[in-house]
Regions:
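Metal-dependent de-N-acetylase/amidase catalytic core
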Residues: 57-206
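Active-site rim/loop-helix segments in enzyme catalytic domains that contact anionic ligands
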Residues: 1-73
Length: 206
């Protein structure tokens, strides 16, 4: 087994599809949903930066904050959305992915971020999800339903209809990723080490 910590950067306060809740109410509800869903997946700890939804733009500042979290938690692997995915239009996902990548390669520097008092730490790998160029496929056959049980807890985000569409999509995607392998459903990640993330022009082909 392993210990998993969820870091949620924004507070989700733009996520009320009904338009009936105020910002603080929806933020509190989104936090509750995140924790409930995470517990379904076996997440042990939760961290929230509580930045307003749709507000992210300062990659260096966010990267420094994430680096401090990395140095405190000392993770083996960092998971984040792939910020270089073509046609990804969700700015908060893009900025968070870029900041996480910057933090991943910089958290081992003794003076990064400026003024830090935490000890350097280098995670072994960063794994980008929602990627178009996976280099690692994990067997998720036995955990596929657990994933959707967790997703279903995000009631402010996913209607039954949308959840059903995602089930079809991820099932088809999982079958495609599992082709030629000895399992039925796969999930793809772009997994890179720290040396791949700076001045390494072959990284897209790895």
């Amino acid at each position: 087994g392993c210990s998993i910590t969820y870091l949620t950067v924004t507070n989700g306060d733009l996520g009320d599809s009904t338009g009936t809740l105020d910002f603080s109410e929806i933020a509190a509800l989104r936090r509750e949903e995140t924790m409930t869903a995470g517990k379904v997946l076996g997440v042990s700890d939760f961290l929230f930066y509580d930045l307003p939804d749709g507000s992210l733009s300062d990659i260096p500042s966010l990267a420094g904050r994430i680096a401090e979290t990395i140095r405190t938690l000392q993770p083996d692997v960092i998971f984040c959305p792939d910020p270089w995915a073509q046609y990804e239009a969700h700015n908060d996902h893009i900025v968070t992915g870029r900041a996480a990548a910057q933090a991943f390669i910089s958290s081992s520097l003794s003076r990064y971020p400026r003024g830090t008092r935490t000890a350097p730490w280098q995670a072994g790998a960063i794994a980008f999800y929602f990627t178009q160029k996976p280099n690692t496929v994990i067997d998720v056959t036995d955990t596929f339903e657990t994933r959707f049980a967790a997703m279903a807890e995000h009631r402010t985000q996913l209607s039954e209809e949308l959840l059903g569409l995602y089930r079809i999509y991820f099932s088809m995607q999982g079958q495609k990723l599992a082709e030629g392998k000895d399992f039925a459903l796969g999930e793809g990640f772009k997994v890179l080490g720290p040396l791949h993330m700076h001045c390494f022009t072959e990284a897209p082909e790895i």
